[in-house]
Swiss-Prot record:
This is GDP-Man:Man(3)GlcNAc(2)-PP-Dol alpha-1,2-mannosyltransferase. It is a single-pass membrane protein. InterPro entries: ALG11, ALG11_N, Glyco_trans_1. Residues 234-254, 400-420 dip into the membrane without crossing it. Residues 1-19 are lumenal. Residues 41-233, 255-399, 421-492 are cytoplasmic. One of its GO terms (biological process) is dolichol-linked oligosaccharide biosynthetic process. Its EC number is 2.4.1.131. It is found in: Endoplasmic reticulum membrane. PANTHER family: GDP-MAN:MAN(3)GLCNAC(2)-PP-DOL ALPHA-1,2-MANNOSYLTRANSFERASE (PTHR45919:SF1). Belongs to the glycosyltransferase group 1 family. Glycosyltransferase 4 subfamily. GO terms for cellular component: endoplasmic reticulum membrane. GDP-Man:Man(3)GlcNAc(2)-PP-Dol alpha-1,2-mannosyltransferase that operates in the biosynthetic pathway of dolichol-linked oligosaccharides, the glycan precursors employed in protein asparagine (N)-glycosylation. The assembly of dolichol-linked oligosaccharides begins on the cytosolic side of the endoplasmic reticulum membrane and finishes in its lumen. The sequential addition of sugars to dolichol pyrophosphate produces dolichol-linked oligosaccharides containing fourteen sugars, including two GlcNAcs, nine mannoses and three glucoses.
Amino acid sequence: MAADTGSWCVYAVLRFFYSLFFPGLMICGVLCVYLVIGLWVIRWHLQRKKKSVSTSKNGKEQTVVAFFHPYCNAGGGGERVLWCALRALQKKYPEAVYVVYTGDINVSGQQILDGAFRRFNIKLAHPVQFVFLRKRYLVEDSRYPHFTLLGQSLGSILLGWEALMQRVPDVYIDSMGYAFTLPLFKYVGGCRVGSYVHYPTISTDMLSVVKNQNPGFNNAAFISRNALLSKAKLIYYYLFAFVYGLVGSCSDIVMVNSSWTLNHILSLWKVGHCTNIVYPPCDVQTFLDIPLHEKKVTPGHLLVSIGQFRPEKNHALQIKAFAKLLNEKAAELGHSLKLVLIGGCRNKDDEFRVNQLRSLSENLGVQENVEFKINISFDELKNYLSEATIGLHTMWNEHFGIGVVECMAAGTVILAHNSGGPKLDIVIPHEGQITGFLAESEEGYADSMAHILSLSAEERLQIRKNARASISRFSDQEFEVAFLCSMEKLLT
């Protein structure tokens, strides 16, 4: 009797849900229809708005080209790509209107342009219109202590919506890695869209870190120690990677900055027919003016690091390896050594990280030998590189590494991380000759630094000559040719 009652209850529940299936399906269908109609109405409204503010020159309507770059005043390698891209486009298409969506609301457009000139020595020939976005906080990583990738990606859609509501372009370029804005501008804004990808939001390497339960800056120790949490995070990553691939595939053209990035984007976005490597522009000519002889104003050796103070740059590894070098090798080398960390601070989070690094150097007892140079001018940067013996880079799987190229062009002996762009594209043999060194661990960096410093001046000079000869492929001129070739599809 109890079994019959139980069977009847299960049957009743199933019948109840079955009775809801078709009404639910109809409701979902109606909602989808309303959503499509709503998006169509919004698109129609935006197109009318675009026509009402469009301008013409010599009787021809001007094309509006917009770059989505919320941190355009940050002063990093990604910003150099932005300004060089604008300079190249203005040369070839001077009649177009150029717009930059930025969240740098505390400065004026002219101050942003002046900063680009000071840091990168880049001056644009024609005006640029800046659209200032007030909701940039939606893409700050500090806002999402958990589910950071998802939070920032959803936040970028809202930030993109703010941008689209202020100015509707004809051509939209995501130059900072906010791929979730692409379908918004393509299907709602009616734009032709493209991407310049510095670093995939998620990569197969990140999946491997979680799968193997390895701790890292994007995989907290409490998760890596727990098999259940690791499994849950892996599922989250796989789902996110699937959606990331869908939004990325909306691009009409895709430019990537290295072989490493290309491999990951092809795996995730599956748009090989419109994807090309466009190496980022590195100001090699300016640095090539630095003499190669070892000019020494003070005795000893200077070790220089270039890179924004972000967690993935792993400046802590540089300080730890340098402390190890001083503690274990300095007596053998007999030199006065100094480490100078040069980089840009975008916000309070970056400033907090700098203070943490200062504390680390104090705890390791090397504070007298470590200096921090924040948001310095281009001339100051060039001066430090002219005095440096070693250029340091410690980011795991750096997408490319403009700082690495700049160090090589300036004549430092580069010591970079044995992964990503530096390993695959930059610190590679030139005509069979060594162009620099690679390392991974604290001990490996300390040993490599000691080895470089133990070389004779003539041996270091030969390595520096090899490095300089190998980097012509990363010049501004090469970037302009490749970038304009890719952009032609969107502008013709």
